[in-house]
Curated annotation (Swiss-Prot):
Region Mediates interaction with ZDHHC11, annotated ranges: 140-419
One CC-aspect GO term: nucleus
Sequence positions bearing Phosphothreonine: T3, T75, T235, T251, T402
Role summary: Key transcriptional regulator of type I interferon (IFN)-dependent immune responses which plays a critical role in the innate immune response against DNA and RNA viruses. Regulates the transcription of type I IFN genes (IFN-alpha and IFN-beta) and IFN-stimulated genes (ISG) by binding to an interferon-stimulated response element (ISRE) in their promoters. Acts as a more potent activator of the IFN-beta (IFNB) gene than the IFN-alpha (IFNA) gene and plays a critical role in both the early and late phases of the IFNA/B gene induction.
Pfam families, alphabetized: IRF (PF00605), IRF-3 (PF10401)
Source organism: Sus scrofa
Cross-link (Glycyl lysine isopeptide (Lys-Gly) (interchain with G-Cter in ISG15)): K191, K358, K364
Transmembrane segments: none
Disulfide cross-links: C265-C287
Keywords: Acetylation, Activator, Antiviral defense, Cytoplasm, Disulfide bond, DNA-binding, Host-virus interaction, Immunity, Innate immunity, Isopeptide bond, Mitochondrion, Nucleus, Phosphoprotein, Transcription, Transcription regulation, Ubl conjugation
PANTHER family the record matches: INTERFERON REGULATORY FACTOR, INTERFERON REGULATORY FACTOR 3
Known DNA-binding region: 5-111
Protein name: Interferon regulatory factor 3
Amino acid sequence: MGTQKPRILPWLISQLNQGQLEGVAWLDEGHTRFRIPWKHGLRQDAQQEDFGIFQAWAEASGAYTPGKDKPDLPTWKRNFRSALNRKEALRLAEDHSKDPHDPHKIYEFVTSGVGDFPEPDTSLDLSGRYSTSDTHEDSLDKLLSGMDLASDAGPQSLTLALEQPPQLSLSPSVDAPASCPNLGVRENPLKQLLANDDEWEFQVTVFYRGCQVFQQTVCSPGGLRLVGSEAEDGTLAGQPVRLPDPAASLTDRGVADYVRRVLSCLGGGLALWRAGQWLWAQRLGHCHVYWAMGEELIPDSGHKPDGEVPKDREGGVFDLGPFIEDLIAFIEGSRRSPRYTLWFCMGQSWPQDEPWVKRLVMVKVVPMCLRALVDMARDGGASSLENTVDLHISNSHPLSLTSDQYKACLRDLVEDMDF
């Protein structure tokens, strides 16, 4: 006997009524508003029960079988969010996912109530999955099946998109539809940013006592490693970026000696690499390293650092998800442009209470694709002139989009991320 994938809304209502999943609950007597726990998987206080609703949907929908499939929390979470976002009867009312004490999201039904979505028949068939049907959603499926909707682009379509990038003007346009260009024919070009085989390009700038002494652009599998001028371990991953000997640029011998001492403690170096939507860092030597997000011209030295790069494990230093959300808000005029420049202070504490130029070794790392995205947003909102932007990642091509299309592609990119 065949099985049918349960409908997300009747299934979710059933879970809410049962009240067995931690933090998943109705918020009003009319059963129109409910909350879902939304803790990030990388938080140190994350527990298995924080993600029970995502795993439950993965099991019910047949995407995950315990004991057979490998657990994949980001995919479970992304699929659950995408399933809810596709339902017009539901909307995100409040987003508290970044609340440090109780991260959650509040959804509400915009129809007359949950009576429009009867609970499923939760009897199990031989496979152990739910067998259910829903008249309301079945009618929607029939309506959609009669429309000419292109399927998602596969590998062949993606190849075509890379060989023939869209040539559209980057300008505000009332005539342009607010959707990614020809998504049925070619993949959203911005999704290259998350591709496992596409490496970001980084511009590395080194300062000794506030003086720029070095700049290099790096694009390499495995990311990069900031290493001292002495010989380093070539067996480690990441392209080594060798910081120059201070004697070539500093006239003060005493300062040069101190800088050289910092470089000698770098050991295997400071590793920086991308995995999915995150940039990760780890120090492989004895030299302590502090980091913070700042402007391209100067670090945010008037405040505390965002953190210290860990030695015994990797630490996240940048999340593309909030950056894209802030970029959309910037395009809409509701906030300033998001920051994307990483500053690292090596061998000394972060310059919180004094000028950053007093520090011996400061390194600035700019992900060039993020600079391109911000430049694209600025140009699209400030000018009607055509502009072509290179994302500065491997296998990328010059990209041109209208302002509306660009914003829609950014929103589409957010759907593929884990929050």
